[in-house]
Amino acid sequence: PYTYWFWMNGNITKEGITKDLEAMHRIGIGGVFNLEGGTGIPKGPVTYLSPEWSELKAHAIKEAARLGIDYVMHNCPGWSSSGGPWITPEYSMQKLTWSETEVAGGKRVDTLLLRPVTELGYYRDIAVLAFPSFKNGKPVGFSDWQLLNNSVFNHRGKIGIQTYDKEQVIRLEDIIDLTNQVDSLGRLNWEAPLGNWTVIRLGHTSTGRKNCAAPDTGVGLECDKFSKQAIQLHFNKMMDLLYPLIKPYVHQIQIGLEIDSWEVGMQNW
């Protein structure tokens, strides 16, 4: 059988590593999943990916090979999912973000479009689109509303597909692509047709999600799962350091990387 083997927030020594592995060997443990956590544990002296850390990792792999214990390491600090301090916002998980600007047509529109909400100061435009506005500019009043009963149903409604009025559907042929009429600062210059228009400035930004339960010196952004460059950046950061440590023992024991769980939310870009 395999077991989890946590190194807690940099509190690691060669003596402790040897004693742990020898104890596992005595009771028949055949392999370890070596993860590094830091939830509520005081910070120890070893910094993640430091030369001292590499020396301890090499010692652990050597001792595991000596005892015939397979060695599998989590692919990043923490137990979820694939990230670290080396991931910068442009290589982090991405999400769509947008702003809406209402403009009146029948004239040339020269206006600075609102910048969408961003995370970590990182934003890139994708497209600028316009469609006939459903808004008439009249506010919805509710001053005469009165709360009759402060209660909620004790059950959920039926799960199903929500239907919408056909008038709410934006027809594809009514959408105008204005991407090429917006400069790098987000200023729109457009000869707008008659009518009221909603202009969407669509872009992407970081989700801001970080690896879960990592040691203090290993906390960082999650890599972009839709980007080959981001995944290679993350993988190489680990393997460039680990491969020389692993290579002498690959024919003695099973050595690998694993992703323990997914607790970093979703991305849609």
Per-range role (PLM):
Residues P1-F6, G37-K43, N211-C223:
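Acidic/histidine-rich, surface-exposed loop or edge segments in extracytoplasmic proteins
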Residues N34:
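Short beta-strand and adjacent tight-turn residues that come in two discontinuous sequence segments
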Residues I12, G16-T18, A23-I27, G31, ...:
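Mature extracytoplasmic enzyme cores
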